[in-house]
Regions:
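Conserved active-site loop/cleft motifs that coordinate metal ions or position small ligands
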Residues: 237-239, 273-274
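C-terminal accessory segments of proteins
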Residues: 195-213
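Catalytic glutamate of the conserved HExxH
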Residues: 63, 204, 208, 240
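Active-site-proximal inter-transmembrane loops
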Residues: 145-150, 209-235, 241
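Non-catalytic, topology-defining segments of multipass membrane proteins
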Residues: 1-200, 246-334
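Generic hydrophobic/packing signal
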Residues: 56-58, 111, 204, 223, ...
Length: 334
């Protein structure tokens, strides 16, 4: 019988953070809540910290540094660097480098650090628990970030910064609220665990659950419910084909608070050069995907060459019109 493949060794620190912390939260938060209770102020602050961490990951780590979707004032960059460190998802340099590799090699089980092809558990958090070769640091795709003084300051001092943001700041807040332990449990521990899994949903569920209106070349899906949970990151199929767009939700009614935050920052002079994909390119992607599906359906049926040729000819004529007009728009975009 062939020998069973040996799994890479567990990473102790990551195992404590991603397995131990949730278990502690599951046990300690309900116990403290039952015997001591949490104040309304503690719940409000937990939500504030959660959103500041989350938007710093989506608006800072992700759309600003990983994808260069816009430019930001130094004050905003420092804000993202500090509160992003509070999310305890590694430094900007490591996070953005991994994410760029994910986009370049999406669904490649050997090169995508959190490939959905290796299963829901692996893409959600399994990839961080063991020392997989696909997760090795390689900053050759992040030379621009290595020249960024704010990014490199945070990278060098990451342990100190994230410790202060996750322990020191909740401790000071707890002293101010008159309940140190309760604040550490709610604003510190539970907020951190929730923030982790909200982000992890994008790597996992957003590659398994939802629709693929813009491209079927990878596993990324659009999912409005996940967008609500993830500060607008749930329109993942769109994002994977137009990754440099500062928006994920392109329609006015789509929930994307990260987009709204970036736009507000632009109004305040804190952001500029927002990248917005032209509408005709979006329409072209939709048409390409619809045509590919229609062609597959024809081939799956009778294989009628006449129908297939007619479909291809009509598609070519229509796309030529799109290229000439370049302003085709059947829906309203922001």
């Amino acid at each position: 019988m062939p020998e069973k493949a040996v799994k890479p060794a567990l990473i102790p620190v990551n195992t404590v953070i991603f397995v131990g912390f949730p278990l502690l939260a599951l046990i300690l938060v309900p116990l403290w809540g039952f015997y001591q209770g949490f104040s309304a102020a503690q719940w409000v602050w937990a939500l504030v910290f959660l959103y500041l961490n989350g938007l710093s990951i989506t608006g800072g780590y992700h759309r600003l540094w990983a994808h260069k979707a816009y430019e930001a004032h130094p004050a905003l960059r420092w804000f993202f660097a500090l509160w992003g460190a509070g999310a305890l998802q590694n430094s900007i340099l490591i996070w953005a480098s991994d994410h760029r590799r994910h986009h370049r090699h999406v669904d490649d089980n050997e090169q995508d650090p959190y490939s959905a092809g290796r299963g829901l558990w692996f893409s959600h958090m399994g990839w961080m628990l063991r020392d997989y070769p696909s997760g090795e640091n390689d900053f050759s795709n992040a030379r621009d970030l290595e020249r960024d003084p704010i990014v490199m300051w945070q990278h060098r001092h990451y342990v100190a910064v994230t410790t202060f943001m996750n322990l020191g700041l909740p401790l000071l807040l707890g002293l101010a609220l008159g309940d140190v332990i309760g604040t550490l449990l709610l604003v510190g521990l539970l907020r951190l665990v929730v923030n982790h899994h909200v982000t992890f949903f994008i790597n996992s569920l957003a590659h398994f659950w939802g629709s693929r209106p813009y491209t079927e070349s990878n596993s990324a899906r659009d999912n409005g419910f996940l967008a609500f949970l993830t500060y607008g990151e749930g329109y993942h199929n769109y994002h994977h084909i137009f990754q440099n767009d500062y928006r994920n939700g392109i329609r006015w009614w789509q929930w994307d608070p990260t987009k709204w935050m970036i736009r507000l920052c632009a109004t305040l002079g804190l952001a500029s050069n927002l990248v917005k994909v032209p509408d005709f390119r979006i329409q072209r992607a939709l048409l390409d995907t619809q045509f590919a599906r229609a062609r597959r359906e024809l081939e799956a049926k009778a294989g009628d060459e006449t129908l297939r040729e007619l479909l291809e000819r009509e598609y070519q004529l229509f796309t030529e019109s799109v290229n000439q007009w370049r302003a085709l728009q059947s829906e309203r975009y922001e």
